[in-house]
Amino acid sequence: MPKRNDIKKIMIIGSGPIIIGQAAEFDYAGTQACLALKEEGYEVVLVNSNPATIMTDREIADTVYIEPITLEFVSKILRKERPDALLPTLGGQTGLNMAMELSKTGILEELNVELLGTKLSAIDQAEDRELFKELCESINEPLCASDIATTVEEAINIADKIGYPIIVRPAFTMGGTGGGICDTEEELREIVANGLKLSPVTQCLIEESIAGYKEIEYEVMRDSADNAIVVCNMENFDPVGVHTGDSIVFAPSQTLSDNEYQMLRDASLNIIRALKIEGGCNVQLALDPNSYEYRVIEVNPRVSRSSALASKATGYPIAKMSAKIAIGMTLDEIINPVTNKTYAMFEPALDYVVAKIARFPFDKFENGDRHLGTQMKATGEVMAIGRNIEESLLKAVRSLEIGVFHNEMTEAIEADDEKLYEKMVKTQDDRLFYVSEAIRRGIPIEEIADLTKIDIFFLDKLLYIVEIENQLKVNIFEPELLKTAKKNGFSDREIAKLWNVTPEEVRRRRQENKIIPVYKMVDTCAAEFESSTPYFYSTYEWENESKRSDKEKIIVLGSGPIRIGQGVEFDYATVHCVKAIQALGKEAIVINSNPETVSTDFSISDKLYFEPLTFEDVMNVIDLEEPLGVIVQFGGQTAINLAEPLSKAGVKILGTQVEDLDRAEDRDLFEKALQDLDIPQPPGATATNEEEAVANANKIGYPVLIRPSFVLGGRAMEIINNEKDLRDYMNRAVKASPEHPVLVDSYLQGQECEVDAICDGKEVLLPGIMEHIERAGVHSGDSMAVYPPQNLSQAIIDTIVDYTKRLAIGLNCIGMMNIQFVIYEEQVYVIEVNPRASRTVPFLSKVTNIPMAQLATQMILGENLKDLGYEAGLAPTPDMVHVKAPVFSFTKLAKVDSLLGPEMKSTGEAMGSDVTLEKALYKSFEAAKLHMADYGSVLFTVADEDKEETLALAKDFAEIGYSLVATAGTAAFLKENGLYVREVEKLAGGEDEEGTLVEDIRQGRVQAVVNTMGNTRASLTTATDGFRIRQEAISRGIPLFTSLDTVAAILKVMQSRSFTTKNI
């Protein structure tokens, strides 16, 4: 059926800020869908609160609203825009839940807005556990034995009937939030109590555990004419029990017999047809390895993380097809954009193996609970393509950027046998490395299969990798063996280690023996049809399918997997860089390893190489393509770290040169540069051991800010107040050495600002200055930022502009740079300079309407600001006020402390814009899910040094009608100053929570919690009590503030919304 002509205007709801379980894959899906609908001639209106996305660029939709995805704001936009239809299945769980809410309020009916794509009834059937159970029973599809509980007692009764272990799944939550596997009644009580609070409908599914079954996924598509196909099927390396977002996944499935494959395929198509889904859908199934028994685990009736992976694994653009199906087109009339010959009805066939490995945030959160279960914990993922499992797995391992280049890890090598067994049985993020080590120690794979329930087929592949290692050790420089190792994904570095030579030597011998990679095309049809996609992966075989063109070529390095400190913002900059290169008539080639993002959509660049971002893999592409040069400014620290090795190998780095990058990153060189330019920085020094650090701190004076050099996102950074804490830090957090010094700086608790600047070598443009709401000491990525600044005097603004110009010219910056300042006692100091695009680029580009990454790329390629019509200096400021707010994923990460400090902890960002600061703040808090009730109680438990400042805030809360609750010390101080306060008991390290502030939080007696720890390393009880208070607030979804500056900001909002009542 051709597309519909009775609708003209379609609204799409985005997925909002990035959180664990809902990441960049929705930017990719949403961007594809908006463009697909525009391509078909519809007017597209987009609502999304996340400024860091390509999707929210002005050119992606006809009208873009960066507003909170809440009932209040989406309803306003619906009334204003009056669209004919709404497409909710591309915005993750956020988009779906919003559509459900809108439908329930009756506004869609009132405005006559039709829901496109999958019908609400089908979404309900797939998402509501009870309805889904009924549906599966009606079509004879087997589910796990289960029942719904709405209270803890009900859950216990159900569990007794089914038998332990039990899986708990709260209804309508994303990424398995609040769920888990329970072996005992005690565990069940705890998980269900929390799950019921997190479920918007207060219900949990209590079901039999089938841990140990194989987990298989089918990505399916169906249209309104009941045509249905399988786009891709995938198999998890880990058995059922680990969330598929955290599992290692292979596509296509590897261990299924043809009968099993067809049986599960039939089941998937059976379910999608019964649900009458129109568009993409993901079906998860569990298969008993010892029989033909299977269970349906769940269905996602929307585009998901798995569909982004399936799109990149096959080249079949699922989100684009889903959008076209939503407007009435059918699979047999949509052309497959990869081959431009076949129709979308044609099921993709793969002649390669794809491996996906998740990227976890535990390098940032050392105390986090690393155990993997049904709740997702990964922030991002990498994908690699090879001709066999070994090749794709090892390529994926080195794409992770966790300091390993092979499936071996120092911690695993150093573990004793007892620890090794424990780590194999416990599913953790690093289990692959312990399993590999067990095989190296000669533990039989049958025994490992028994312990881990990982299929013996996969373990046999790991055993083959170990056999190649053993042969390499004894056959040094043997060309045939070198070829075998390369065919199975071994890196030059790993071979060099086994041969005890340098990686350069291995590279030289490879080239002498003509052992160089060829590049194969991803074409969706296993080369059955001619294909024109410029989408390639490397392998060691015969025919090279990537033909070098005659055009001038530029290679752009992407930013790899999404992790805390390096998010989708860098992908945004990469895509804009590509656009600028193309606009100048050159060929843009992208190298990246992240399947979730827009930059790895093959229609974005002229050529896409899906490869690990390591020196070897990047160099191989450069050898083939012979580009004019490589741009490293937009790929975060990942790309910057490759600048030096590439430059040493004779590759031209475009933009700021390597020695100047070094001057910004290396502490001593940077200090010298600042002295030469006469720019002040906080007094500081470098230390290579504990004694030196103590001597430096005594000279500078406490408090000091201490951190290792060369980091992104403030890893292992702390504010320290005395010598005891400093010695503790030096022994616990860092391994200081002359190669890896530690930086000790005076900590100035002043106002923090940051600037992004663009420089052509002579002139400097500052699109804007952002002022941070939280004082210096909170990582810039976790601070709320306001543009234009509200509290800076003209003199200070002038100084900031002057210092920025001096630095950009003095460091020979070509392209982009980011500078952070602190203003202390009316003096401006420079804290740090990043000679690259930073995470504020998308936000600032959107609010100033200056396409910063594109402009910087033009500078890198030799244009200048004047010719492009830009005045040097600070760009004029707009009338609106814009606030960028950080968004955290603490609900997903047990045992991770939410206290803000110099270590970055946020996973995403939201934005609020309006005519006054108060309104913009209100929107940014709403968009970041920090909704404050209009009245209620606020709980204060603050450090002694913060009590004075708390008094003013408490008075303001009382003034607008909030009741005050506080622990003893804080309460006494507030009472002395004439406030009425209800006192609650501290935990005092005890287990009993009755009558304490934790019980108050748990029972919903407080609407907000203000908890500060001060700068002194607190006593153990205070620290653990504070941690328990914060955990409780987070798991109950109660706004928690650990910085008084944020409290002052939210009070501004509340005061602007409340009326004063005064007697006469």
From Swiss-Prot:
Binding positions (ATP 2): R707, S746, L748, E752, G777, V778, H779, S780, Q820, E832
Binding site for Mn(2+) 3: Q820, E832
Cofactor note: Binds 4 Mg(2+) or Mn(2+) ions per subunit.
GO BP annotations listed: 'de novo' UMP biosynthetic process; glutamine metabolic process; L-arginine biosynthetic process
Keyword ATP-binding: yes
Residues bound to Mg(2+) 4: E832, N834
Keyword terms, alphabetized: Amino-acid biosynthesis, Arginine biosynthesis, ATP-binding, Ligase, Magnesium, Manganese, Metal-binding, Nucleotide-binding, Pyrimidine biosynthesis, Repeat
Residue intervals of the ATP-grasp domain: 133-327, 671-861
Cofactor: Mg(2+); Mn(2+)
Domain MGS-like: from-to ranges: 930-1064
Oligomerization domain: annotated segments: 402-546
Residue sites binding Mn(2+) 4 per the record: E832, N834
Induction comment: Repressed by pyrimidines.
Sequence segments annotated as region (Allosteric domain): 930-1064
Example of a GO MF term: ATP binding
Residues engaged in binding Mg(2+) 2: E298, N300
Function (record text): Large subunit of the glutamine-dependent carbamoyl phosphate synthetase (CPSase). CPSase catalyzes the formation of carbamoyl phosphate from the ammonia moiety of glutamine, carbonate, and phosphate donated by ATP, constituting the first step of 2 biosynthetic pathways, one leading to arginine and/or urea and the other to pyrimidine nucleotides.
Subunit structure of this chain's protein: Composed of two chains; the small (or glutamine) chain promotes the hydrolysis of glutamine to ammonia, which is used by the large (or ammonia) chain to synthesize carbamoyl phosphate. Tetramer of heterodimers (alpha,beta)4.
Domain commentary: The large subunit is composed of 2 ATP-grasp domains that are involved in binding the 2 ATP molecules needed for carbamoyl phosphate synthesis. The N-terminal ATP-grasp domain (referred to as the carboxyphosphate synthetic component) catalyzes the ATP-dependent phosphorylation of hydrogencarbonate to carboxyphosphate and the subsequent nucleophilic attack by ammonia to form a carbamate intermediate.
Protein's UniProt name: Carbamoyl phosphate synthase large chain
Name of the encoding gene: carB
